[in-house]
Swiss-Prot record:
Record: residues binding a divalent metal cation: D97
Binding site for substrate: G74, D75, N76, L77, R96
GO biological process: regulation of RNA metabolic process
Enzyme class per UniProt: lyase
UniProt keyword DNA damage, yes or no: no
Domain of life the protein comes from: Bacteria
Cofactor note: Divalent metal cation.
Full protein name: Putative 4-hydroxy-4-methyl-2-oxoglutarate aldolase
Role, per record: Catalyzes the aldol cleavage of 4-hydroxy-4-methyl-2-oxoglutarate (HMG) into 2 molecules of pyruvate. Also contains a secondary oxaloacetate (OAA) decarboxylase activity due to the common pyruvate enolate transition state formed following C-C bond cleavage in the retro-aldol and decarboxylation reactions.
Quaternary data: Homotrimer.
Named cofactor requirement(s): a divalent metal cation
Length: 159
């Protein structure tokens, strides 16, 4: 079993440490996987498309620009991720249906909750490098999450 603290000790010069504070909403507190990215503004169509197409074990990183206008993820989309065996979802934005999310057996991190739903226009970008939390989130890098933090590595550190 790995811990982010141990990975930081062992691979200190090879990691990025996310400086953003997230809240955990999913059933899993610890998760890791290869990163896939989505950048959107108050629109979760590309989030849904990503969840429906990404391979098992992936972590979808959603940059919603920390917008407080709406939630980008709720129980329906999280259930798709669970059904498809994704490792987790990290949202630089907000979620809703939090009482249901805690029963979804994946990792889910977000800034907080917002009851308002997103628009459905399909605007945004997928598979691009993102910048938030003081780190660069690049597709196909690896992210490791537990109760102590979020770290990113260009290579797999744990199998």
């Amino acid at each position: 079993m790995w811990k982010t603290t141990d990975l930081c000790d062992e691979f200190e010069n090879e990691l990025q440490i996310c400086r953003q504070s997230f809240r955990s909403f999913g059933k899993k507190e610890q998760f890791h996987g290869k990163i896939a990215t989505v950048k959107v503004k108050d629109d979760n169509v590309l989030v849904k498309e990503g969840l429906q197409t990404l391979p098992e074990g992936t972590v979808l990183v959603v940059d919603g620009g920390a917008s407080t206008n709406c939630a980008l993820l709720g129980d329906n989309l999280a259930a798709i991720a669970e059904e498809r065996k994704l490792a987790g979802i990290i949202v630089n934005g907000y979620v809703r249906d939090s009482s249901e999310l805690k029963n979804i057996n994946i990792g889910i991190l977000a800034l907080g909750t917002m009851p308002n739903r997103s628009v459905k226009e399909g605007k945004g970008d997928r598979n691009i490098s993102l910048q938030f939390g003081g780190v660069e989130w690049k597709p196909n890098d690896y992210v490791y999450v537990d109760e102590d933090g979020v770290i990113i590595s260009e290579k797999s550190l744990y199998r």
